[in-house]
Amino acid sequence: MQEQYRPEEIESKVQLHWDEKRTFEVTEDESKEKYYCLSMLPYPSGRLHMGHVRNYTIGDVIARYQRMLGKNVLQPIGWDAFGLPAEGAAVKNNTAPAPWTYDNIAYMKNQLKMLGFGYDWSRELATCTPEYYRWEQKFFTELYKKGLVYKKTSAVNWCPNDQTVLANEQVIDGCCWRCDTKVERKEIPQWFIKITAYADELLNDLDKLDHWPDTVKTMQRNWIGRSEGVEITFNVNDYDNTLTVYTTRPDTFMGCTYLAVAAGHPLAQKAAENNPELAAFIDECRNTKVAEAEMATMEKKGVDTGFKAVHPLTGEEIPVWAANFVLMEYGTGAVMAVPGHDQRDYEFASKYGLNIKPVILAADGSEPDLSQQALTEKGVLFNSGEFNGLDHEAAFNAIADKLTAMGVGERKVNYRLRDWGVSRQRYWGAPIPMVTLEDGTVMPTPDDQLPVILPEDVVMDGITSPIKADPEWAKTTVNGMPALRETDTFDTFMESSWYYARYTCPQYKEGMLDSEAANYWLPVDIYIGGIEHAIMHLLYFRFFHKLMRDAGMVNSDEPAKQLLCQGMVLADAFYYVGENGERNWVSPVDAIVERDEKGRIVKAKDAAGHELVYTGMSKMSKSKNNGIDPQVMVERYGADTVRLFMMFASPADMTLEWQESGVEGANRFLKRVWKLVYEHTAKGDVAALNVDALTENQKALRRDVHKTIAKVTDDIGRRQTFNTAIAAIMELMNKLAKAPTDGEQDRALMQEALLAVVRMLNPFTPHICFTLWQELKGEGDIDNAPWPVADEKAMVEDSTLVVVQVNGKVRAKITVPVDATEEQVRERAGQEHLVAKYLDGVTVRKVIYVPGKLLNLVVG
């Protein structure tokens, strides 16, 4: 073997071998335990970033480890290829989204191969191909026939610049997350899937997900937002209809002093006919976005509608206000306000001088002080007529029962979760397979017209979707009658909700899934991706699995047994202030830094001499220009070094700070491993290891080897603390580097140790390990080698450390054979100078001996 470690030479050779041998291609095999390891599929943006590299390295380490345990391991990859960025890039580069996307896929595929990930490339899929989305379209038509799909007019966040609907989460500070244009409210007809029909199951089955992070489960619970309460009907004077509100706190009902309705509510619209102030307010609300996260913090505003509702229990008239914190699409579009016991209602009432009536006593039994804030804790009722003295639960039931008996109340279970709006007014997505006939009938596209293919050879003007701009595209014939196709496309969360299942049978032509293959591989054993997907993707992913189960395609309730959310990758961020006061972000690669004695950055400038402001470590991003190109790092250090650093620098679920000094350290370590194997193999063949003939020192070294195997196995397999596994291998390497290599058994022991080290490192650094395994004459390819097993006998300690005390004070620590008797330990202790000194001329009155640990001599 060559003396120097040259990753640029070995890595491409090993990758070619994997390609030619199709090492990672798998098929169903009932005789083997399966393991399905999946990382979230990437969007083909054009280049991999370090976040991708971290995600896929974690997945590859787990997949290779499980393979070495003898399991049938599936690790597929594909491309989440539809979406808005392709449209923007196409306009910018004067091309169409399809060629831009396919070019990116080809480029990024090479980048993934360059990093040595062990994917089954025969299963690669791209969600923008008709071969993929045809089954999604077919499934949608089946859901429609089952009554799980409907169309309704809905208020949306509309970006006038991108001409598209935005999800609440895509509205930041009232503006579009992508182009920063002010968002408007707009009513348009859209398609919905009834995820609410599965709300209870989605909620209850979270309890089955023992190996999902609690944070993700809590976020989903809150998002589904199940609550039990009462729906109450109010009569409104001089108004033709009643108002219905929902409350989870009927115990506070006697403190209700006003009602609030959404600006879009029919009552507000009617009142605005003669109220210019209210009309202007409604207009303002129409153009304000309603992302829930912002609802809590935005300024609460309202206008009195002039209508008065009648409190069903007290008969009092209470005002009805239009307020910006009430949403038409949540519940009934109206809420009851109890300012004494709800902080939002309190702030609104204080601002507009509305009545605040306390009805719950403070914890000490006194009347609450409402001069500064509402009392939101539960407690005993007062000021509530016949309900005085009741605690929360009793009052909840008594008031609910009375309202029900009067015919103005009904107990209800409510959900925050809304049905999933899947319509997007974009071009680059899967066409929604619905048609409208000449007579106005709306129906699913017939099976013989599926897939509805998206034309790829289009011209983008950056404003109108090409399939909306071309009236011919929508024309079709159904049942002999002219019809128009739907020109909206699916939300791209549709494609990413079922791809994991299609990986089990990507070539299957008879339907969406081959149930036999799907049920062999599913559920996914470990799913790896960022926590930012906790509520949207991961909820739709679970929902789709249940839909496919109910369609008879899969036989499990949940799509993934374990979820691992990797931490973000951070890097140093620098900027200088430009002439107009703007911040110009400078890549950390271009920053020349000075550090103090503790290694902290104290000064920085760029090549042009600008003084740079250092803002610390922050998430790698385009906006701060602090991304590090993985390709540059691989070309500089090799893929194995980058992978090793990624897994060593931080626990997988914590943030990782990118430090090139750490990358250099990982590279030095691999050079040391190479050097040790080189020096060992240069001495020629090795004799067989005779464990019975080992010296004490050799036994001690072998004990270290097998203890390391045991620790690394536990760290990777059970604990998934990959960084501590690598640290243990490094520690063992330090010992091996100092071990004698002269004797026959020294070399035999070194051979055993190096074969173990190379196999333990293999999941992390597969190229160097593939090569070193061959140099060490390991059996076959390392890709088919079994994981090393710790020898229990080798780990047994021959000797143990005993603490010797005289009258409870430590006087010595002695090493004795594990099987030494108490007499032998006392005799050995007596040979210690300090112990002998304290025993001289005194009588030992009592001996306390804890075998193998402690000897305490009580003297007097």
Swiss-Prot record:
Q: Which CDD domains match?
A: Anticodon_Ia_Leu_BEm, LeuRS_core
A Gene Ontology biological process in which this protein takes part is: leucyl-tRNA aminoacylation
| Record key words, sorted | Aminoacyl-tRNA synthetase, ATP-binding, Cytoplasm, Ligase, Nucleotide-binding, Protein biosynthesis
**Uppermost EC category:** ligase
EC number per UniProt: 6.1.1.4
- Which residue ranges does the UniProt annotation give for the motif 'HIGH' region? 42-52
What family does the database annotate?
Belongs to the class-I aminoacyl-tRNA synthetase family.
Oligomer and partners:
Monomer.
Protein name as catalogued: Leucine--tRNA ligase
Instruction: Give the source species.
Output: Escherichia coli (strain K12)
The protein's gene is named leuS
